């Protein structure tokens, strides 16, 4: 097994070159944005990868976001578009709830572990002690040859992790395991 810890176009370049060399070992990574996966192209990408969001997510919020994005821009949103959208939604919620733009008040609000609808099945929150966003993630692999219907349809998304009966914090180090101090 080959494990990578690359980001952005480094991942895209790596998977294209890996496919070119025809190496037989499975590849896994720690993050892959959908736009980078699409850029790698069908036939180049393999293995198992995580992502924070994808356009096939079947929640009402995600379906509405995808439909509105497609109507306005004429294409499927990749997860960076979702990140930008929900980041602004979270900030708007904090501004509304605190009725303030004061930095200390906003930090206190985020540290309160307020819940945010980020268009997934479960709400997200920022962990108070390290500011880590606790949220679901999604594994994906590549569809079998001939299954895809287009350039952006060759990824096969799995169920959310952690499982619905597991706490979101099970994806992150505990306070005892972490050196992060905020």
Question: Residue ranges of each PLM-predicted region?
Answer:
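Extracytosolic ligand-binding ectodomains
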Residues: 1-182
């Amino acid at each position: 097994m080959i494990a990578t810890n690359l980001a952005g176009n480094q991942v895209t370049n790596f998977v294209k070159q890996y496919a070119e060399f025809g190496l037989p070992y499975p590849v896994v990574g720690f993050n892959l944005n959908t736009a980078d996966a699409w850029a790698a192209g069908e036939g180049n990408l393999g293995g198992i990868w995580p992502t924070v969001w994808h356009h096939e997510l079947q929640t009402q919020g995600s379906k509405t976001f995808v439909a509105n994005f497609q109507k306005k821009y004429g294409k499927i949103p990749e997860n960076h578009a979702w990140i930008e959208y929900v980041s602004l939604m979270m900030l708007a919620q904090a501004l509304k709830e605190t009725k303030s733009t004061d930095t200390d008040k906003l930090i206190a609000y985020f540290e309160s572990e307020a819940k945010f609808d980020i268009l997934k099945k479960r709400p997200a929150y920022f962990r108070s002690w390290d500011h880590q966003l606790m949220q679901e993630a999604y594994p994906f692999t590549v569809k079998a040859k001939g299954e895809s219907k287009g350039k952006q349809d060759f990824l096969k998304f799995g169920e959310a992790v952690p499982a619905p009966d597991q706490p979101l914090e099970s994806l992150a180090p505990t306070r005892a395991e972490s050196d992060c101090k905020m």
